[in-house]
A protein has these predicted regions:
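Bacterial N-terminal signal peptides
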Residues: 11-21
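N- or domain-start disorder-to-order transition segments that initiate the globular core
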Residues: 38-80
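Active/ligand-binding-proximal structured segments within catalytic/core domains
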Residues: 78-120, 124, 334-347
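A short, sequence-level motif marking secondary-structure junctions
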Residues: 10, 28, 77-83
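Bacterial N-terminal signal peptides that target proteins for export
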Residues: 2-13
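Short acidic-hydrophobic surface loop/beta-edge motif
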Residues: 61-69, 303-314
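Charge-rich, well-structured scaffold segments of protease-associated domains
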Residues: 32-42, 107, 111-298, 319-324, ...
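Sec-dependent signal peptide cleavage junction
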Residues: 20-32
Length: 455
């Protein structure tokens, strides 16, 4: 998934629905025709319609609804895409490197009160009529998307996901925690005591110089915030996690008031999804959430940090360093962030002065530039590989000189036209993608209509 698609994940709340009092023939004529009973202020299965609109890029009618009892947000995008999708997402902040959100993501789909089978999730993936079924943990949220060509099947998957999220078996079965998180293993009396577990093993395999450099860079740029933590969990920290911590985390954040539900595609009976959601949400009372970062201490002067990464003896270390240079863009407005996003594209272009200057100064180095928006403040991040620790000053001078040249001379119209053409084509092809509904699981919780357009 591209960084641009992941832009702005840190808010969460708004949605839609369609009450089907229309005749089936009318629905067949237009899958996205809005019901006259979906006017703003209408209440359907405990959800109040708060916004109606259109998403022309996807040829979709949009509706945002809010659950009257809990404040949970539901977002419908109704169009003629038969690859229908359902998703529920929660803001799941990080406070350490144990990987608790990741472990719970795995444990969630290990069975629930209504579906008490640890193997059901995999049976559904491989033996039922779905086109996508998964879950994912990101820096600021955990999301549970599923897609199907059958609306009836999608409704059943939604029921499975909702019960799994709100009534997981892990509360009663510690073995699920031990299986997914970590446990001690002893193959024989003479064997050494080892640690195993699905998430522990997964994160051992995912550990790399590049990922370590990324987390260390964000920790230095945003000290005290969630940005420096590994959402998947650090293998050295995962064994300090307890079963009680995982249960407490679920109690704290898996709540309807902290959720965004998205339903996408040729949905003929939105009311059925609303009835299902109302059943899942109604046992809860409204709850306020505060995702401020009181421990965040903004940097006020340049910070330099060198981190070591262990490698096997004999590993080639020449030109093997990864360097991050990050510029915090404090209080950048949304418009300014859009400009910065375009700037990073221009600087990353193979014909840019930055790339050209770097090739001359450090022939083995590669560089990329992106706008980071998941942190407390937006930041422009330069990432260089294929260099040595002693080359940092040369890299810094290349960046400064290139940005200054860009500011003084601008960019050629040919390059602007090429990028504009590329973006236009990318946008035009978006509606042809097969996983549009699944990708919508990455939108913000606070303003889904606007965030869907950004994505």
């Amino acid at each position: 998934m591209s960084k641009r698609l992941l832009r702005s994940l840190l808010s969460l709340m708004v949605c839609m629905a369609m009450l089907l009092s229309l005749a089936p023939a009318a629905l067949a004529e237009s899958a996205n025709a809005p019901s006259t009973e979906m006017a703003v202020g209408a209440v359907i299965h405990g959800f109040e319609v708060v916004e109606n609109g259109e998403f022309t890029l996807l040829n979709a009618k949009t509706t945002v609804l809010r659950h009257q009892k809990t404040g949970a947000t539901v977002f419908f995008l109704i169009n003629e895409d038969t690859n229908r999708a359902f998703d529920i997402s929660f803001v799941t902040p990080l406070s350490d490197d144990k990987g608790i959100p990741h472990v719970f993501e795995h444990s969630t789909l290990d069975g629930s009160k209504k579906y008490p089978s640890a193997s059901l999730f995999f049976n559904l993936i491989y033996q039922t009529y779905n086109t996508y079924m998964n879950a994912a943990t990101y820096q600021v949220m955990t999301t549970y998307p599923v897609a199907s060509l059958s609306e009836a099947q999608l409704l059943k998957y939604a029921d499975f996901y909702l019960d799994s999220c709100f009534n997981p078996m892990i509360y009663e079965d510690e073995s699920l925690f031990r299986s997914e998180a970590w446990r001690y293993s002893l193959e024989s009396a003479d064997s050494p005591l080892t640690i195993s577990g699905t998430v522990y093993s997964e994160m051992q395999g995912a550990a790399s110089l590049e990922t370590s450099a990324s987390y260390n860079a964000m920790k230095a740029a945003f000290p005290g915030s969630h940005m420096g933590y590994n959402q998947g969990g650090e293998p050295t920290e995962i064994p300090s996690m307890t079963w009680q911590e995982v249960k407490d985390y679920h109690t704290a954040y898996y709540h309807p008031s902290n959720s965004l539900t998205t339903v996408y595609g040729a949905i003929e009976d939105p009311a059925a999804f609303l009835a299902l959601l109302d059943e899942a949400f109604s046992p809860y009372e409204a709850k306020a959430f505060d995702f401020s970062t009181p421990d965040y201490a903004p940097v006020t002067s340049p910070v330099e940090k060198v981190c070591q990464y262990p490698v096997y003896e004999g590993t080639e270390t020449e030109n093997a360093a990864v360097t991050y240079i990050t510029f915090i863009c404090e209080n950048a407005t949304e418009e300014e962030q859009n400009v910065l996003d375009l700037l990073t594209m221009l600087l990353s272009d193979s014909s840019s002065a930055l790339v050209s200057n770097l090739v001359d100064a450090l022939p083995n180095a590669d560089i990329s530039v992106y706008l980071e928006t998941d942190g407390p403040e937006p930041a422009v991040v330069f990432v260089a590989t294929g260099m040595n620790e002693g080359d940092v000053q040369t890299l810094r001078e290349c960046i400064y000189a290139s940005v200054l040249e860009f500011a003084e001379n601008g960019v050629s119209q040919d390059i602007l036209d090429a990028i504009a053409s590329s973006l236009t084509m990318e946008t035009a092809l978006m509606s042809e993608e097969s996983d549009l509904g699944v990708n919508l699981s990455l939108i913000h919780i606070s303003e889904p209509t606007r965030q869907a357009e950004i994505s």
